[in-house]
Each structure stands twice: as structure tokens, then as C-alpha cells.
Amino acid sequence: MSKRLLGAIRSFGDPGTYVQVLRLLHYYGYSHVQERRKLTLGTGSTIAPNISFANAERITIGADTKVGERAFLWAGASTGRITIGDHCRLGPEVFVTASDYGLMPDETIAHQTRNERDVVIGDDVWLGTRVFVGAGVEIGAGCVVSAGSVVTRSLAPGSIAAGSPARVVRRREDYAVLAERPDEPEAVPSVSAAHES
């Protein structure tokens, strides 16, 4: 018998093989699996298997975008959309929501009115680990938001923001060069080359 055949026979006898099958069956039962089928996912984009989606039919993720482990993408129940551009990176445990609640003085917390507003994240945006993005926020193309930041107001393109609430701490000087790059990979200038010229 060949080594390959013996390896396959050993794999079928290994309890770990069946544990993986059970994990897949368990994963299939999660509600976010059905939600994942509803979202619009661009070419070459990847999302971690343990993301929480709400109302995914109102979520659009562009091409070549990566969404990290345990992220939350919660669109509004009726109108609030989440749109994420191309070439974005969302770190682990990022939370993006297109709805929040009011604080009406004569209503209990359980009966507050839900406010839904679209969230737009432009192309080439990097959101660090545990960034929160609230309803109605627009993050311009080329922005970088540091880990743990709370974004409650829109950010202009090329901004680097940090804090709670997030504030612009500087701008990407290289962003004008990167934004004008052609689609062909071989013609894309390096960041260091852009600084030398």
C-alpha cells in the first residue's frame, strides 16, 4: 500500500476528523450563516467565519476587503445600510452599526425609538481591532482608525484618527499618491518611492 493510502486510512480512524465534521455541522446552525448568504460580497474579499451579521441584505462589502475575527456588522432593521469599499481591512472585533436609539424623556429604555442611518466606509480604509463605528458615519477613502477608537462623526479622506470619541491626529501624506494609482499592480509606486520624489 502507498503512504498516501495509509495516511487516508489513519485519518478516517482519527477522532479529530469527526470532531471537525461536528464543528461544521454546529457552525451551520448559527444564525449568521444564513445572514451571510444575503450580503453582497465583492471579488477577492474574505470574512472570518465567526462574524455577527444583522440584516445582511443591507450590507455591501467591496472587492479585496478583509474582515477580521468576531466582527459585528449590524445594518438597520428597515433602512440603515452598511457599505464598505474596496481594499479595506477591518480588524478583529470591529463593530459597525447602522442604527442606534434615542433618549426620549417620557419613554422607558426598552421603548426608545430606533434611529437608522447609513454607514459608508470608503475604499482603502483600515479599522484597527475593536473600533466602533456608529450610525450615520461616513469614513472617507484612505482613512486609518486606531485600535479601540469610537467613531461617532464622519472622517475626511486620508485621515488618521484615534480615541474615544475618535479625533483626527494627522493625515496620510502619501494618500494623494496612492489614490491616483492605476489599476495595474506593476505600475503602483511604493510608498517609499513616493516620499523620495
Regions found by a protein language model. Give the residues of each.
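Terminal amphipathic alpha-helical/low-complexity segments used for targeting or macromolecular assembly
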Residues: M1-R37, T43-G44, H87, D100-M104, ...
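Flexible, glycine/small-residue-enriched loop-and-beta-strand segment within the central core
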Residues: G29, I51-V137, S164, R171-E173
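Generic structural signal for beta-strand residues in well-ordered domains
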Residues: Q34, K38, G44, S52-A54, ...
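Residues that flank catalytic or metal-binding motifs in active/ligand-binding sites
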Residues: P92, A147, P157
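Beta-rich strand-turn-strand
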Residues: T129-V144, S149-R153
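Acidic, glycine-centered active-site loop in nucleotide-sugar glycosyltransferases
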Residues: P157, A162-P165
